[in-house]
Amino acid sequence: VITVECKFNSKVKELLKSVDINIKELERYTNFILNEYKGTRKFWFYELTIKMIECDTSGYYFGENHIELGNKTLKRNIEQKRKWYLSSYFHELCHFAQDNLDKVKESKLNYTDKDASECNNNYYKNPYEVQAREWEEKYTEAYISIYY
């Protein structure tokens, strides 16, 4: 059984509330996803810190169990913003799973910040980034269909 306690800072709580995302529902859904992804009889407990940053990107820090969600988006309405923040969260949650459940070393994500900002093939075709984009699409759509 995998249990993740999500520790949202006050700014990210405010951000998610502004687009009608219930953080308790999001935490329960997070635990559901991770237990479906990696079935185990062991008890694994993690604390995952999620904070808001003033930018248009998000990030996960391998080895630190820390997600940063950017608050800047060009999306105009609440539904588009909600989808944007959720997809960013699920993308970074995939990196959390890669780090903690799959034991992927950060060095396997062998691209630079420049590669990521340019979205070139080093970044875009990296198998761990491909998987994270798949999580974005799959879990964002499922979450929205369940809760909205």
Language model feature labels by segment:
Residues 49-83, 96-100:
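Active-site scaffold of zinc-dependent metalloenzymes
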Residues 6-17, 118-148:
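Long, well-structured alpha-helical subdomains associated
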Residues 91, 95:
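Histidine-centered divalent metal-coordination motifs
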Residues 2, 6-64:
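Auxiliary, metal-adjacent structural segments of Zn-dependent hydrolase domains
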Residues 83, 87, 99-130:
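Post-HEXXH active-site segment of zinc metalloproteases
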Residues 35-44, 103-105, 143-148:
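Surface-exposed helix-capping loop/turn segments at secondary-structure junctions
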